[in-house]
Amino acid sequence: MCGILAFLNNINKSREYYLNRSKLIRHRGPDWNGIYCSSDEEIVICHERLSIVGIDNGSQPIISKCGNYILSVNGEIYNYKNLLHNVLHDRYECTTTSDCEVIIYLYKEFGHNFIKMLDGIFSFILYDKNKKEVIISRDPIGILPLYCGISENNSIIACSELKCFDGDKLLELDVVLPGTFTVFQY
């Protein structure tokens, strides 16, 4: 179990603010915490990691070799080896030993259609710098939680737990439904 958290279209928040929000879900992943901030600070992705696969070098958020894709995942992709070898035909060299890194390469090859290829339990946040979009998704069974809210200043927050929304005046708060994905463009 990990904790994932993203802020999109942010307005005047400090790095300390994001770190404090991330600490609210630290119990979900005590082994590592990481944060990614886009250069304009419009996109912030935080990760609290519980190491299961890729214990030594599976830190998240995962940043692709080219630097254009940033990924934070709560979960496990059971068929990642099959996907790397038989679907992607070993065209990509993984930079981590994480089972979740395959998500980046599937997205590059198949766009949003890749999600139905995943066998596992997961919720994830994937940022594509080139397309200026963020994708959030949950597995078809909905084992791992993911919530999404829109604040009064039109910031979008996605998180593993509701407590990350405390203190924000929300216009909308929803559970990301199992087996679905949402794309946010900015």
Q: What is each PLM-predicted segment?
A:
Residues M1-Y186:
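Cysteine-centered catalytic environments shared across enzyme families
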